[in-house]
């Protein structure tokens, strides 16, 4: 069908409950199909297992194994102020922050990967050709008050500037930290 690399599986919560044997067969097929993965950490851990007795399922797909297999993992956030997740805020740094906790991705490289999963990897999954800061790109970016990807997730920094097509559309004063 010519769909390699152009198909994404969203949520994939059932993979959390699969035994290792079944999962090992399925992930091989996903890699062969060059499938993209879009877990939705905030909603997945809120709804999945909600009505279970103990032990309760966490409900987020097997992100570490999917990344290790070479699949593109781009975190999503599809429920905002609705009956399924009334706490949604459209804040993708919040999504990545939750994902690294739920998926046990707290190593240095894993945390950087979580940041990428809401930035560059997401753009790759969406086939956004003009993403980035190279000549010819749209010039869409957010400037954060932090020094690196890990601080972006750890500190929940002030968004100093939001820039769209090279124009500042929002700005904020820096936060003074004690």
Enumerate the language-model features and the residues they cover.
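Active-site core of metal-dependent hydrolases
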Residues: 1-59
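C-terminal cap of metal-dependent C-N hydrolases
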Residues: 124, 135-178
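Glycine/Thr-rich phosphate-binding loops of Rossmann-like dinucleotide-binding domains
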Residues: 17-18, 47, 109, 152, ...
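Active-site proximal loops enriched in glycine and acidic residues that flank catalytic Cys/His/Asp
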Residues: 11-13, 39-42, 75-79, 137, ...
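His/Asp/Glu-enriched, well-ordered alpha-helical/loop segment
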Residues: 5-6, 47, 57-144
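Short, solvent-exposed amphipathic alpha-helical segments in soluble enzyme
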Residues: 25-26, 54, 90-92, 159-160
